[in-house]
Amino acid sequence: MRTGIGIDTHRFADGRPLILGGVEIPGERGLAGHSDADVLTHAIVDALLGAAGLGDIGQHFPDTDEQWRDADSLALLRAVLERVTAEGWAVDHVDATVVLERPKLAPHRNAIRDSLAAALGSVNVKFTTGEKMGFVGREEGAAALAVATLEPIGP
């Protein structure tokens, strides 16, 4: 069994949708990024890559490569799951937290969890605020953290 941790942050940007776990969240602004800026899925991708010993998201999907511009992060997640599986690992569980002042995410919990569970299987998502401290508390951006546990495939 192996465990990996992932973290990601993105600034807010006007004129972009807020995508978390592949779900568009209604609100005034989204997150800036080369891809769809899904901070939650990016943290999960990094946790999976770390657990499998496969580096990090920037090595696999560099923001200097135009092919990843506006990429659907769930597609990146599925690609990483294929690589993890090819290395002989299966997802046991993923636990993730989004840190964001607003909008409030609790009403979207089931949709986000269901979206991620379709790819991952066992997943838990949590939400918290920055308690008005730091870049999250000043509503400059959002952060996400994830822990992934992998188990070997087969005997």
Name what the model sees in each region.
Residues 2-8:
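Short amphipathic
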Residues 13, 17-26:
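Polyampholytic, low-complexity intrinsically disordered segments
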Residues 25-35, 63-68, 132-136:
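A short glycine/serine-rich beta->alpha loop
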Residues 37-45:
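Short alpha-helix carrying the canonical HExxH Zn2+-binding catalytic motif
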Residues 47-90, 101:
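Glycine- and Gly-Pro-enriched alpha-helical subdomains that act as flexible
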Residues 93-104, 108-138:
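Short, conserved loop-to-beta-strand elements that form functional interface hotspots
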Residues 136-155:
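C-terminal edge-of-domain segments
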